[in-house]
Amino acid sequence: MRNRIIVSACAALAMFAIQAPAHAAATDQLQSFVTGVKSARGEFTQRQVKGQGANGKVTGTSSGTFVFSRPGKFTWRYTKPYDQLLQADGQTLYIYDKDLNQVTERKLDGALGSSPAAILFGSNDLEKNFVVKNGPTRDGVEWLELTPKAKDTQFERIGIGFKAGNLEAMELRDAFGNTTLLTFTGMQKNPPLAADAFRFTVPKGADVMKQ
C-alpha cells in the first residue's frame, strides 16, 4: 500500500523549511518555496489514515530521510519499518526494494505530471497542473489547497501546511476519503550536494524491471 501511494505520487514528497515571511498567505509561502528552494534535505514521518476527521484511523506509520535538487533529482529513503529507496537522476526514477532485492525503473517525465512530486521536484509552473487556493488555518498551521486539473490522478486534493514561514506538513487525500499525512523535521534548504549525489547504482544481484 505504501509503495503504491508513493509510486503514484511519483516518488513522493521530499520536504524542507522555507524562510518565507511568517505571516504571509500560504500561496505566497509556496511561491517562495518553488522559487527560492532549489535543493533541500531532511527527515519525514508518513502516516496512512483511513477515513477523515474524528473517525480517521491510523493504519500505518513509516519514516525516513530525503534530499532533492530541482528539477527532477531526489532521493526518498524509508528506514522504518523497513528499507526502501526511491531515487531520480533527472531522467529516470528508480525504486529499490531491499527485501526483494528488486529495482523498478520508470521514465521520470511521465512519473511527475500532476502528482505531489511535481510540486516539490518539478518546475515552478504549478498553475499548469493544479488549481491553487488558500485554505484554513488549523492549530497555527496555514494550509494551501491544490486540486489536480487532470482527472486520472490518484489524489483528488493536496494540502500543504506552513507555520512561521516553514513547510510543516502535506496531506494527500484520495477519492476514497483516505489520507496520507507527511510531517517534516530537521530541514536544511539549499545545502551543498555532490555532483553525483543522485546517481543510482543497481545493487549487486538485484533484478531490474523497466516500466
Curated annotation (Swiss-Prot):
Belongs to the LolA family. GO terms for biological process: lipoprotein localization to outer membrane; lipoprotein transport. Disulfide bonds: none annotated. CDD domains: LolA. The keyword Hydrolase does not apply. It is found in: Periplasm. Keywords: Chaperone, Periplasm, Protein transport, Signal, Transport. It comes from Cupriavidus necator (strain ATCC 17699 / DSM 428 / KCTC 22496 / NCIMB 10442 / H16 / Stanier 337) (Ralstonia eutropha). This is Outer-membrane lipoprotein carrier protein. SUPFAM superfamilies: Prokaryotic lipoproteins and lipoprotein localization factors. Participates in the translocation of lipoproteins from the inner membrane to the outer membrane. Only forms a complex with a lipoprotein if the residue after the N-terminal Cys is not an aspartate (The Asp acts as a targeting signal to indicate that the lipoprotein should stay in the inner membrane). It comes from the Bacteria.
